[in-house]
Structures are given as C-alpha cells and as structure tokens.
Amino acid sequence: MAPRPGRETVGGQSTVAEPPPWERAHRPRPTWGLVEGDAIAPGRTVLRRIGGGKRFEVFLVWDEHRLAVLVAKVLRPDHAEDPAAMRDLVREGGLLERIAHPVVVRGFGVAADGPFPHLVLEHLEGPTLQALLDRHGPIGLEQLLPLGMHTASALHYLAREGVVHLDVKPDNLVMGAPPRLIDFSVSRALASAARLRKPVGTDAYMAPEQCDRSRGALGPAADVFGLGATLYRALTGERAFPRPEGARSSADLAVRFPQLSREPAPLPRRTPAAVAELVTAMLAREPGDRPTAAQVVAALEPVVAELPRRFVLGRRGWRPQR
C-alpha cells in the first residue's frame, strides 16, 4: 500500500518524525487539506470542513448512495495508521450501529480500508447547548427542562442497551426538537467500561468514579452525573465544580477533579425547588445516591408538562424567549 500523504517511508514503513516538545506545543495539527469536491470514498465527496479535534477532522460530505448530506469524522494523517485510533473509530461505529433512539445521533458505518479512514454520521442542524450558553448565558426552564428530560430518556435507553456515553456535556448536545446526543468517541459497552484504568471524559463533567478509577466500576450513574453537571452549567452559566487555573495538569486527583471532595455551590434561588433537588441529587458523589436516568425522566415529566411552550426561532438559531 502506498504511504499516505504527509508521511516519510523508511525501510518500507510509513513514519512521522517527532518534533521536540517545544515545537509540538505550538505546531498545527496535521490535516489532509481536503477541499470541496475531494472524494474520501467512492460516492462520498467533501462539501466543506466543519471542525476537528486532536485525532479527527470533521467534514460535511455528499453521499451519492443515500443522496444525503452527512458528516464524516476522518482520522488525521498522523493517526490514520495508528492501531489504537483505528480501534476507537471502529468501536464508536459499532456502538452507533447498535443504537436507535430519537435523541441519539445516527451512525452509518465506518470506512476503514480507504486512504481516509472515517466514520459516517447523520448531519444535524442547530447549535450545541454550549454554543447557546456562549451566546446567551444561562437558558430558561422552557428550554432546559425538556432538554434534560429528553437526554435522560436517551441515557435510560443506553443503559438498557448496556452502553455508557461517558462524555455528556453541553458541547455534545445539539439543540432541537428533540435535542440530540452526539460524540460517542469515548463511549463503552458496560463490560469494557469496567476495565478502564485511566480517567476518560471531560474533566468538568466527569463523575467521581470516572476521575478516580479506584472508586469502582463505571456504569450508567456516571452519565447521570454528567447530565447533572450539564444542567447545572445551563442553569447558572458556571461549572458545578470550578477549579484553579493550571489544575488540569496536576498529578493530584483532588486538585484536578474538585468533584472528588467538594460540593457544588447552591443553585440560584429562582430555580424551582424540585429541579434544584433533582440536579443536586444527580451530582451526588456516590453512584448509588444518584437517581437513575428513568427516575430523572419521571421527576421532570410533570414539571415539563406545566411549562409554556415559548421558543423563538431567529436567524441565528434557537434562543431563549427573554
């Protein structure tokens, strides 16, 4: 097989030269440089680049087989031949093939054999909850509580299917009717999650048992904690467990993860008592002290039923009625 672009071939092996640490810190991430019209697979062409992360570039693509606009999550050049990255891509695709729920993004399989290994996903319109918070600050109960109820229903379904998401956060919730839970890149089947030895997820939204793997096996309660931290952020505009600047790199777990030893600040007084009690319970340190996702749905249903349906669809997307 010919080496992929951007790589050197030494002794028949495709390699990437490692720059010194001071260069790696500021070096742009490797990119395929794909532009509109480039094919990443037969019948699948790039429309535009829409994002990316450490290991992936994300493109909007046109799929001739489905006659639809989809999303392709493409491994970056420096990870395209990395067995661990490929394994994670295939795992994510396999999990999504098992899942069919109206609040979960749909997956359409993995193309692992071509020059641009990628996962194909449903294209979702609308901003993420994080984008909404960045634009408007804390959102109203009319938006927040249906979001919480729908997301909890998805988490209940995942638990029934033996899957834990492990990265529930505002960036991974696309607003809409219903909202959609995205990004299963760190998700695991329950048996696989129980074998994890290192923290997995996004620090501010990780349950204590995710932060400190000595606390026991990971299960659906970790996702309930993540949703609780997300609802707290949406209600207040602040993290449930703020930490000092620079704590991210601390070797002391208690410094890096304040949720291991601290309680969240009380929610604003304007928060209905039933909602405040529920969110606080979802953030309990011990998994057994948290409600299940099904109990979260049951607690929110009567509150949501009494809310007025006041949404404004502006040119910039969903925003709270002020």
Regions found by a protein language model. Give the residues of each.
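AlphaC helix of the eukaryotic protein kinase fold
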Residues: R76-R98
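Conserved catalytic-loop aspartate of Hanks-type protein kinases
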Residues: D223
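Activation-segment/catalytic-loop signature of the eukaryotic protein kinase fold
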Residues: V110
